[in-house]
Structures are given as C-alpha cells and as structure tokens.
Amino acid sequence: MRSMEGSVPKYPEPTEGSIGASGAKRSWPEVVGMSAEKAKEIILRDKPDAQIEVIPVDAMVPLDFNPNRIFILVAVARTPTVG
C-alpha cells in the first residue's frame, strides 16, 4: 500500500468567490496559500458573523450544515521545534 504521508488531499476549487442566492459570499479562493490568521481576517471582513474553525487539512469535519461555520484547512509545512 502506498504511503499518503506528505500528500495533501485535493478539494474541488470554488468558482471566483461563489455567491449564494442571498447575494452573500460563500467561498474565498483568494485566501488559498495564506496563513490561517490572514485568511480568517479576510473572511471576517466579508462575513463578520462567521464562526471560523481552523483545523488540519486531513481532519474529519462535522457533517451537519451550519450556515455561519467556515472551516480553514491548514497543513503544517515544517516540523514544529522548541526554541
């Protein structure tokens, strides 16, 4: 069996900051590659009532739909070290 270590799952890319029926923005493709903190700042500008959760890219996410919840998926790029 092939090792999946170091691989990042591919998620479908939303189209140009998808806009929902209400006219509210529903996705933020422009934050891909940014730090979680910067992405959160940008998302909160567009959706101040968002409940943002920063989670590892390979984590299980709840399947219940919450229109105010936004997941920011992150991958650790280097080994964390003390000092």
From Swiss-Prot:
Site, as annotated: Reactive bond for chymotrypsin and subtilisin: 63-64
InterPro entries: Prot_inh_pot1, Prot_inh_pot1_sf
GO biological process assignments: response to wounding
Keywords: Protease inhibitor, Serine protease inhibitor
Residue ranges, annotated region (Disordered): 1-28
Site (Reactive bond for subtilisin): 34-35
One example GO MF annotation: serine-type endopeptidase inhibitor activity
Known function: Inhibits both subtilisin and chymotrypsin.
Assigned protein family: Belongs to the protease inhibitor I13 (potato type I serine protease inhibitor) family.
Name recorded for this polypeptide: Subtilisin-chymotrypsin inhibitor CI-1B
Natural source organism: Hordeum vulgare
